[in-house]
Amino acid sequence: MAKAEKGVSAKKIAQERVDILFERAKEARDEPELSARYVSLAREMAMKQRVRLAHYHRRSFCPSCHAYFIPGTNLRVRIQHGKIIYTCGICGAVTRIPLNKKTESR
């Protein structure tokens, strides 16, 4: 077996970089291609290092085209039948999130 590395773990570094990339995507709202690229890089890094994305990161981009959501610009939000419905304005993908006491407390 390989020895564990001393110092900061690779997963912790990856999580910090994912957070930074999502911050950059938020700052680059005016440039949709750049913000989508930041989101794609963050997802790739998280998948490669097997780091889970936080729920607020998972819901901040389109799962289909990886566009960073900006409500009113490229995102339509509706509440119907006990679900929050996100509709991407770029690709038209629909994401349904159950609305229950668990999600309200987050």
Curated annotation (Swiss-Prot):
Gene Ontology cellular component terms for the protein in this record: COPII vesicle coat; ribonuclease P complex
Cofactors: Zn(2+)
Catalytic reaction list: Endonucleolytic cleavage of RNA, removing 5'-extranucleotides from tRNA precursor
Keywords: Cytoplasm, Endonuclease, Hydrolase, Metal-binding, Nuclease, tRNA processing, Zinc
Predominant subcellular localization, coarse grouping: cytoplasm
Annotated binding of Zn(2+), by residue: C62, C65, C88, C91
InterPro entries documented for this protein: RNP4, Rpr2/Snm1/Rpp21, Znf_Sec23_Sec24_sf
Entry EC no(s): 3.1.26.5
Single Gene Ontology MF annotation: ribonuclease P activity
Major enzyme class: hydrolase
Bound cofactor: record note: Binds 1 zinc ion per subunit.
Claim: Metal-binding is one of the keywords in the record: yes
Location of the protein in the cell: Cytoplasm
UniProt GO BP: endoplasmic reticulum to Golgi vesicle-mediated transport; intracellular protein transport; tRNA 5'-leader removal
Family of the protein in this entry: Belongs to the eukaryotic/archaeal RNase P protein component 4 family.
Subunit structure: Consists of a catalytic RNA component and at least 4-5 protein subunits.
Function of the protein: Part of ribonuclease P, a protein complex that generates mature tRNA molecules by cleaving their 5'-ends.
Entry protein name: Ribonuclease P protein component 4
Organism of this sequence: Methanocorpusculum labreanum (strain ATCC 43576 / DSM 4855 / Z)
Lineage of origin: Archaea, Methanobacteriati, Methanobacteriota, Stenosarchaea group, Methanomicrobia
Gene name as annotated: rnp4
